[in-house]
Amino acid sequence: MYPAHLLVLLAVCVSLLGAASIPARPLNLYQFGNMIQCANHGRRPTRHYMDYGCYCGKGGSGTPVDELDRCCQTHDDCYGEAEKLPACNYMMSGPYYNTYSYECNDGELTCKDNNDECKAFICNCDRTAAICFARTPYNDANWNINTKTSC
């Protein structure tokens, strides 16, 4: 092998090792993030909603700290209802992995008619939450709070 080939091979291996350390993000959450950006016209990055209050982000418990946190609690509850649907009750079909069809036109979100029952339900959960986020004030003091003492 030529030295140039070895360098290319080494670069590919290093790239693959780096990519392997990136945690997988469920596709539906990627779509949800895009819906949030559509509804708020890109005014606030999606990551600001990932660790907000008691319910925005992974899990949730206690009393929501404000109206925005209530949007997240409602979204969590909606996903819980989706998981009970027979149509959403097979492998990789639940709310975190099932992708759906929707449109974003100038901040208006529409879940498309070609979604099956499960996809339509999940799309509506995400659409409702994204609209709620867009119309609700964001309080910087409620980002990255200590959920053990505040929730």
UniProtKB/Swiss-Prot annotation:
Keyword Transmembrane: no
Active site: H75, D126
Enzyme Commission identifier(s): 3.1.1.4
GO molecular function: calcium ion binding; calcium-dependent phospholipase A2 activity; phospholipid binding; signaling receptor binding; toxin activity
UniProt remark on cofactor binding: Binds 1 Ca(2+) ion.
Enzyme superclass (EC): hydrolase
Reactions performed catalytically: a 1,2-diacyl-sn-glycero-3-phosphocholine + H2O = a 1-acyl-sn-glycero-3-phosphocholine + a fatty acid + H(+)
Disulfide bond among keywords: yes
S-S bonds: C38-C104, C54-C151, C56-C72, C71-C132, C78-C125, C88-C118, C111-C123
Tissue spec. comment: Expressed by the venom gland.
Record-linked InterPro entries: PLipase_A2, PLipase_A2_Asp_AS, PLipase_A2_dom, PLipase_A2_dom_sf, PLipase_A2_His_AS
Swiss-Prot/TrEMBL keywords: Calcium, Disulfide bond, Hydrolase, Lipid degradation, Lipid metabolism, Metal-binding, Secreted, Signal, Toxin
Record-linked Gene3D superfamilies: Phospholipase A2 domain
Signal peptide residue numbers: 1-27
Family: Belongs to the phospholipase A2 family. Group I subfamily. D49 sub-subfamily.
Primary role: PLA2 catalyzes the calcium-dependent hydrolysis of the 2-acyl groups in 3-sn-phosphoglycerides.
Name listed for the protein in its UniProt record: Acidic phospholipase A2 4
Organism (species): Tropidechis carinatus
